[in-house]
UniProtKB/Swiss-Prot annotation:
Organism encoding this protein: Arabidopsis thaliana
Location of the region described as Disordered in the Swiss-Prot/TrEMBL record: 145-165
Family of the protein in this entry: Belongs to the DP1 family.
Sequence ranges of Basic and acidic residues compositional bias: 150-165
Encoding gene (name): HVA22G
Record Pfam families: TB2_DP1_HVA22
Full protein name: Putative HVA22-like protein g
PANTHER family: HVA22-LIKE PROTEIN G-RELATED, HVA22-LIKE PROTEINS
Listed InterPro entries: TB2_DP1_HVA22
Amino acid sequence: MIGSFLTRGLLMVFGYAYPAYECFKTVELNKPEIQQLQFWCQYWIIVAALTIFERIGDALVSWLPMYSEAKLAFFIYLWFPKTKGTTYVYDSFFRPYIAKHENEIDRNLVKVKTRAKDMAMIYLQKAINQGQTKFFEILQYITEQSTPKSKAEEKKETTIPKLDDPILKVKENEVTK
């Protein structure tokens, strides 16, 4: 448990914080080197893909011994200058796969965007309809409260106690005693 907690903390530092800082330094140079920018872009693309697959992978294989440590080592391998892990993983695996499936990915993204837009419009329309309904209910309530009542309506609202009312019987008994 403590090992897993420590490993997650180290992963945050060495997998995200340190690379983000190095990327920041590269971007902020007066004349940033294109190779360095390309390296960090590739790194963050790989990290994004790993983060997506990590949800499934963690559930399936996190029980393996040294899984967290291996994940930490892989992140360090990616950015460590002597290993050039990002370049190797990107050029050997990521780029060929994406290039092969790029058209299919683009088509699916267009479908997802269209569905999301359609769903957003449906929910927006429902919210507008519900808002209108509530607005008119409030308006009706306000107009009912502000219109003066006739004397006949006021008499209807005034309740005349019944003779068999238990409260009246108690009071009647008190008076007769």
